[in-house]
Structures are given as structure tokens and as C-alpha cells.
């Protein structure tokens, strides 16, 4: 059984890749600071529709990332180059485990690092997989640690129970390759 807070999955959704560092089409859409994170946590609770877990832990992790790395850069899909290499980052499992075991914040970074090493490519941006609950805010910490922007989008528009429930499934875009990483860095 997978325990929330112990396992994080990163999924590659785009097949194309740009060898150069991230270059947007124009200006970064917005800077996300502590006030915006607080507001997003409220919205994440509403969009969770009763699922996805409480966004509180994700909010704390995002606020800590702002203290450590500075405000986040969020770009729109329109800003994202067509050949951008993007990773969706999220946790999976029962969110009640987080009551006893808080993530250390490096699970997502470890998963992204492992996926980049396996693919031989660096990601241009990170995106949330779902808009609801904890997973709305966790990718912000990963993006900040990796020094890349976060994309203003998600896989469905709310929380969902299974990975195959994302919009990309309708277009036969696979949820692989994928990586899992625990709090000890085991991949």
C-alpha cells in the first residue's frame, strides 16, 4: 500500500525537448508570493471537491520554498514554448498519513532529478498534476528547488482518484515514464 507523504510520482507529459535553457515567448506571467500561496490554498480546498487531501501541508511547503528560494515564477500555457519539456509532479496515496509523517520537501526534487538523469534531459518547467488539495501546491516547492517556472495549468481542473483520470488520457498521451521517490531518496 502506498503511503501519502512517502511516495511522489513525476510524470513526463510532453515528448519534445529543447536543449537550450528555458526561454519563454515573452514575459513571465506572474510572480507568486506568500499572499498568492495563501489564496491558492483556499482555492485548492474548494477544487478538491472532498478529495486530494488538505492543502495545508502543501501550503507550508510552498511558503518555506519562498523563504528559501524567493517568489515563484508562474507562466501560462501560452508562454510555454511548444517544444518545452515539462514534468508533472505530485504525491499519491492516502493523505491521512501526513498527519503523522510530514514530507521533508525533497521527495519531489529527488524524483525529478532521477527522471532527468534517466532521460538525459533537464525539464524546462514543472506543473501540478491536479488542481485540488495538497497536489495543487507541492509542485511549487519542486519548481523552486529546480530553478524552473511552474506552469499555470493542471491535468483535470480538480482533484481526482486515479492517474488515468487526467485530460491527457483522452488524447492517448501516456503517463510514462514515471518515477517514485521516498523521503530517504530511494528511487
Please report, for each region that a protein language model flagged, where it lies by residue.
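Cationic, low-complexity basic patches in intrinsically disordered or flexible, solvent-exposed regions
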Residues: 4
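Short, Lys/Arg-enriched N-terminal segments with co-localized hydrophobic residues
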Residues: 10-28
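Non-transmembrane, aqueous-exposed alpha-helical and coiled segments at domain scale
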Residues: 30-44, 48, 56-187
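Glycine-enriched loop-and-adjacent helix/strand subsegments that border the catalytic/binding cleft
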Residues: 53
Amino acid at each position: 500500500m502506498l503511503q501519502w507523504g512517502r511516495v511522489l510520482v513525476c510524470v513526463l507529459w510532453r515528448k519534445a525537448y529543447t536543449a537550450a535553457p528555458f526561454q519563454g515567448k515573452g514575459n513571465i506571467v506572474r510572480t507568486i508570493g506568500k499572499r498568492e500561496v495563501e489564496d491558492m490554498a483556499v482555492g485548492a480546498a474548494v477544487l478538491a471537491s472532498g478529495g486530494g487531501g488538505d492543502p495545508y501541508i502543501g501550503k507550508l511547503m510552498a511558503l518555506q520554498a519562498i523563504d528559501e528560494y524567493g517568489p515563484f515564477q508562474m507562466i501560462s500555457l501560452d508562454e510555454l514554448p511548444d517544444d518545452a519539456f515539462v514534468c508533472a509532479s505530485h504525491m499519491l496515496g492516502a493523505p491521512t498519513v501526513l498527519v503523522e509523517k510530514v514530507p521533508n520537501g525533497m521527495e519531489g526534487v529527488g524524483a525529478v532529478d532521477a527522471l532527468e538523469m534517466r532521460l538525459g534531459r533537464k525539464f524546462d518547467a514543472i506543473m501540478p498534476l491536479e488542481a485540488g488539495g495538497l497536489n495543487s501546491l507541492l509542485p511549487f516547492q519542486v519548481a523552486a528547488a529546480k530553478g524552473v517556472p511552474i506552469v499555470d495549468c493542471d491535468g483535470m481542473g480538480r482533484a481526482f482518484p486515479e492517474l488515468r483520470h487526467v485530460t491527457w488520457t483522452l488524447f492517448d498521451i501516456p503517463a510514462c515514464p514515471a518515477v517514485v521517490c521516498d523521503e530517504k531518496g530511494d528511487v
